[in-house]
């Protein structure tokens, strides 16, 4: 029987670095999490996961079965290095190949959702052509995802092109495909001049997961919980009242901390307390 608990997960980069997924999932279970979100970023080390052998993929699946801790989502930030909007055809082709491999990987190991980074380009100057290429790249990507039955979910970003749910909804309407949805980050959403609660309500019916972190205007990473501008209780209340029942993911970058597990446990307790205050009694 499926649990009625609110699924609460932790980002891979919050936990100690390494490639042993059995150890990582066991630690996540000990810390009280339901799932771990995998990172495939722009480093060669994490990009190489997309070329894992059959045996390596099976080892991940076996670790999931053994621990009972799922890996239902992938944060695919590799497109910062190989953007779909690049005006360099070779770079853009690499970006599309990364997407193809990520979708195949997800299909093989049971990942249901791939979070996309909403950058047309990251290290280059953006223009109308980079945005057009980005849109076309998303269209190709969603066609691949549809065939594989893997959801692509756009993150609300630290970048003007995709810094609100309203903007991301424009792409959802343009693509008009059930395999393209939204993955808001309430930290990023709050760091911009957005009506956060209205934005969350506007996204209902398209939100498949939520990133939980604190931010300040212009500071999108490593802001300790409670020291930023995010009104967590109101965000949780709005999502609950709007009918959202999906997963929440605590996003942290504590893998290089002196004691990552202690940092994560502290953050989990802090977030769960705010969830309880917001009336999400299942999370108390």
UniProtKB/Swiss-Prot annotation:
- Looking at its record, which EC class is this enzyme? isomerase
Under what conditions is it induced? Induced by L-ascorbate. Repressed by UlaR.
Keywords attached to this Swiss-Prot or TrEMBL record, sorted alphabetically, are: Isomerase
Statement: the UniProt record of this protein carries the keyword Isomerase: yes
Q: What EC number(s) are associated with this protein in UniProt?
A: 5.1.3.22
InterPro entries (alphabetical) = L-Ru-5P_3-Epase, L-Ru-5P_3-Epase_Enterobacteria, Sugar_Epim/Isomerase, Xyl_isomerase-like_sf, Xyl_isomerase-like_TIM-brl
Catalytic function, reaction form: L-ribulose 5-phosphate = L-xylulose 5-phosphate
**Residues forming coiled coils:** none
Question: What does the record give under GO molecular function?
Answer: intramolecular oxidoreductase activity, interconverting aldoses and ketoses; L-ribulose-5-phosphate 3-epimerase activity
Is Isomerase tagged as a keyword?
yes
Q: Which domain of life, per UniProt?
A: Bacteria
- Record GO biological process: L-ascorbic acid catabolic process
Q: Name one Pfam family in it.
A: AP_endonuc_2
- Tell me the route in metabolism or biology where this protein functions: Cofactor degradation; L-ascorbate degradation; D-xylulose 5-phosphate from L-ascorbate: step 3/4
This chain's function reads: Catalyzes the isomerization of L-xylulose-5-phosphate to L-ribulose-5-phosphate. Is involved in the anaerobic L-ascorbate utilization.
Q: Which family does it belong to?
A: Belongs to the L-ribulose-5-phosphate 3-epimerase family.
NCBIfam families xref list = hxl6Piso_put, PRK13209.1, PRK13210.1
The name this protein carries in UniProt is Putative L-ribulose-5-phosphate 3-epimerase UlaE
The organism encoding this protein is Shigella dysenteriae serotype 1 (strain Sd197)
């Amino acid at each position: 029987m499926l649990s009625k608990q609110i699924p609460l997960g932790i980002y891979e980069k919050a936990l100690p670095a390494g490639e042993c997924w059995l150890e990582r999932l066991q630690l996540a279970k000990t810390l009280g999490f339901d799932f771990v979100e995998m990172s495939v970023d722009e480093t060669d080390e994490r990009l190489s996961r997309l070329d894992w052998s059959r045996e390596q993929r099976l080892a991940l699946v076996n670790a999931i079965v053994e621990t009972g801790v799922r890996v239902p989502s992938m944060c695919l930030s590799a497109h910062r290095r190989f953007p779909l909007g690049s005006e360099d055809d070779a770079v853009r082709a690499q970006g599309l190949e990364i997407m193809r491999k990520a979708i195949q990987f997800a299909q093989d190991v049971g990942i249901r959702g791939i979070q996309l980074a909403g950058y047309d380009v990251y290290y280059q100057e953006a223009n109308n052509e980079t945005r057009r290429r980005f849109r076309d790249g998303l269209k190709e990507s969603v066609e691949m995802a549809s065939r594989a039955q893997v959801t692509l979910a756009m993150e609300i970003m630290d970048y003007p092109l995709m810094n609100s749910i309203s903007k991301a909804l424009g792409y959802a309407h343009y693509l008009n495909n059930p395999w393209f949805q939204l993955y808001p980050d309430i930290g990023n959403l709050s760091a911009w001049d957005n009506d956060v609660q209205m934005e969350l309500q506007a996204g209902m019916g398209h939100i498949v997961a939520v990133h939980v972190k604190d931010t300040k205007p212009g500071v999108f990473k490593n802001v300790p919980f409670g020291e930023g501008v995010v009104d967590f209780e109101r965000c949780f209340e709005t999502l609950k009242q709007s009918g959202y029942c999906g997963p929440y993911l605590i996003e942290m970058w504590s893998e290089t901390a002196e004691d990552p597990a202690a940092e994560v446990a502290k953050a989990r307790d802090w977030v769960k307390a705010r969830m309880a205050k917001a009336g999400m009694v299942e999370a108390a």
